[in-house]
Regions:
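Glycine-/small-residue-rich active-site loops that bind phosphorylated ligands and cofactors
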Residues: 23, 41, 94, 117-118, ...
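Conserved coil-to-alpha-helix start sites within the AMP-binding
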Residues: 93-99
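Solvent-exposed, non-membrane alpha-helical residues enriched in polar/charged side chains
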Residues: 32, 36, 50-54, 74, ...
Length: 166
């Protein structure tokens, strides 16, 4: 059965199928090769991927492959210097991956409202929530629509705190 032939509701008792992953034949073959090798995590293929990614964005940058978006955000929070007891502002409208690492790290979350036009974090709401205790602003570019980055950057610069983009 091809991707286009896959029914949206294969079994009415299970509801609407929201996600059906498409994996190309090339990717499937690469995955089979990876799983039949002795390196499941870090190894030659990951090193090759990191090198290619790094070269795409300039040799001065480094690239670290992670197992998931949640892992990537957790690493970003650590690299931003966030620690237990710190306070961050983030959007109320996001995937759990944004907040689970914060909870795991013992960081206090203040939820900002969203703009009704874009569903992105509201700059005005962030302004009301920001304080001397705020250690970062975490924004999510929902549905491919960019947040008001110039406004967020100005606010972050004023309070000397980082912006972490999801």
């Amino acid at each position: 059965m091809s991707f286009k032939e896959f029914p949206i509701m294969p079994d009415k008792s299970k509801g609407v199928m929201l996600f059906y992953p498409y994996v190309s034949k090339k990717s499937s073959n690469n995955l089979k090769r990876k799983l039949s090798g002795r390196w499941l995590g870090q190894g030659p293929m990951v090193n090759k991927f990191e090198d290619k990614f790094k070269n795409m964005f300039g040799k001065k940058n480094s690239a670290i492959a992670t197992g998931s978006g949640t892992d990537s955000l957790h690493l970003a929070y650590i690299l931003a210097g966030l620690k237990k007891g710190d306070e961050v502002i983030t959007t109320v409208f996001t995937c759990t991956a944004t907040n689970i690492p914060l909870l795991y790290m013992g960081i206090k979350i203040k939820f900002a409202d969203v703009e009704k036009e874009t569903m992105n974090i509201s700059l005005e709401s962030v302004k009301k929530l920001i304080s001397k205790k705020t250690k970062a602003i975490i924004c999510v570019h929902y549905g491919g629509l960019p947040c008001d980055m110039s406004g967020l950057k100005n606010l972050a610069k004023k309070f000397k705190i980082p912006i972490i983009e999801d």
